[in-house]
């Protein structure tokens, strides 16, 4: 759990913004959304594999675009 110390004469809005930023960096909200409903292990593996395939295709696409620009 992210903890921030409110500084002397610090407005509430600024402290809240710092807290939100620290929560985002810690990945709390994404973790809560992920655990909101149960995901079967097979679905999780399928989702992760699809993401890996997408990343690989994106990487190849970038490499091809880089080669085209060199000539």
Curated annotation (Swiss-Prot):
Pfam families: Ribosomal_S21
UniProt-listed GO biological process terms: translation
Top-level taxon of origin: Bacteria
The entry's keywords: Ribonucleoprotein, Ribosomal protein
Location of region: Disordered: 49-71
Gene3D superfamilies xref list: Ribosomal protein S8 (1.20.5.1150)
Compositional bias ranges of the Basic and acidic residues kind: 60-71
Entry-linked InterPro entries: Ribosomal_bS21, Ribosomal_bS21_CS, Ribosomal_bS21_sf
Compositionally biased intervals (Basic residues): 49-59
GO cellular component term of the entry, any: ribosome
GO molecular function: structural constituent of ribosome
Family: Belongs to the bacterial ribosomal protein bS21 family.
HAMAP family per the UniProt record, alphabetical: Ribosomal_bS21 (MF_00358)
PANTHER family found in the cross-reference section: MITOCHONDRIAL 28S RIBOSOMAL PROTEIN S21, SMALL RIBOSOMAL SUBUNIT PROTEIN BS21
Protein name: Small ribosomal subunit protein bS21
Record organism: Colwellia psychrerythraea (strain 34H / ATCC BAA-681)
């Amino acid at each position: 759990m992210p903890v921030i110390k409110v500084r002397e004469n610090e407005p509430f809005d600024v402290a809240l913004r710092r807290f939100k930023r620290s929560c985002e960096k810690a990945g709390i909200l994404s973790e809560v959304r992920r655990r909101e409903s149960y995901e079967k292990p097979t679905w999780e593996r399928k989702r992760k594999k699809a993401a890996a395939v997408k990343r690989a295709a994106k990487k190849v696409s970038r490499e091809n675009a880089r080669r085209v620009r060199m000539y």
